[in-house]
Amino acid sequence: MNMIHISPIAATEGLFAGAARTLASGAPLILYGPFFEEDTVTAPSNIAFDESLRERNSEWGLRQVGWLDALAGKTGLSRSARHEMPANNLVLVYRKG
């Protein structure tokens, strides 16, 4: 999924809730895109992109990985992988417990 930065937080919450309801045990929910991470320097291009998104729609913007991890935990998923990708993007893999 490459949509959580261009949709309201409620859409991300719905994505995780839906994944928890429909995924088989061990199946992945894979997120791709730019994120904010605690204790990690954010690339200036990602900061500018976040500002641009929020100017277009105040409900849009880069999400914090820590918040996603907490949301995953509340819905019965946990992060199993983090992969760095080109252009300061990440792949985050969550799996249903």
Protein language model annotation of sequence segments:
Residues 1-4, 32:
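Residues lining the SAM
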Residues 75-97:
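Core SAM-dependent methyltransferase catalytic element
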Residues 23-38:
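Conserved beta-strand signature within the Rossmann-like core of class I S-adenosyl-L-methionine
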Residues 6, 36-38, 59:
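Short histidine/acidic/glycine/proline-rich micro-motifs that form metal-
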Residues 6-22:
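A short, conserved alpha-helix within the catalytic core of class I
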Residues 42-66:
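Conserved Class I S-adenosyl-L-methionine
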Residues 36-40, 44, 74:
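S-adenosylmethionine
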